[in-house]
Amino acid sequence: MIPAAPDCAPVEQRRLLSPEDRQRLAVPPSPPEASPRPAYADRLQPSSLGWVSRRSWCVWIEPDPQPDRFSGLWRQAVDTALARWGRELTLQPVERADDAHIRLWRRRPPRQDGRASLGRALLSLQMVRRGGADRPAPLVDVLLDPGQRLQGLQATALHELGHGFGLWGHSDRPDDVMTAVPGPRPPSDLSPRDRETLRWLLGRPSLFRPEPPPPTP
């Protein structure tokens, strides 16, 4: 385990944002954009407090108390998906679920609007205290059904992690990991459009990023 970075220091307190927090942190409307958004960035939606965007994320993976072949495949798919996103972002493993921004759970998501799904990302905006300082932070629970074949599970993990990392929207092309309708061979890696959209997002102002955004290309 890599030693925890300062931004992944133990969480001392965590709570949902209160109405007073939301009023204080409210983001003013953005001015009109001077140029069209790249790739499928025009399909992304901000949260109620603006873009959920970070360059570094603390990640926790649910351990399996009784490892077997199927749980090994689940972990292999998750590790591969994280490695793909880790080429674009800094992903720091943490040992406690409460210290994470992203938590990956080995479970089938509950039905939503009567429909079943193989994966889901659930976003919660919270106030988190680390080192005595309170900061707004995202918490994303990623639920991944372990009853999938390796290829499908990896594609599901790539897609739901994309939501977790701030890509709250879907591409209209089947070769992007954030596609709304995957083709017969789901993507196994980020496409150039996925990377371009993520880099655009990382250039937007965000309450949830401890570091300044990089220069916009």
Predicted regions and their residues:
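Short, polar loop/linker segments at the starts of domains and inter-domain junctions
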Residues: 68-76, 190-195
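Metalloprotease/metallohydrolase-associated module, dominated by Zn2+-dependent proteases
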Residues: 1-13, 120-152, 168-217
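Disordered inhibitory propeptide/activation segment of secreted metzincin zinc metalloprotease zymogens
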Residues: 1-70, 132, 207
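Divalent metal-coordination and catalytic microenvironments
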Residues: 59, 85, 159-162, 178, ...
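Metzincin-family zinc-dependent endopeptidase catalytic domain
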Residues: 72-164, 168-171
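Generic beta-structure capping elements
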Residues: 62-64, 107, 181
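Generic detector of well-ordered alpha-helical segments enriched in charged/polar residues
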Residues: 41, 79, 103, 179, ...
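Short, acidic Gly/Pro/Ser/Thr-rich loop/turn segments
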Residues: 66, 111, 185
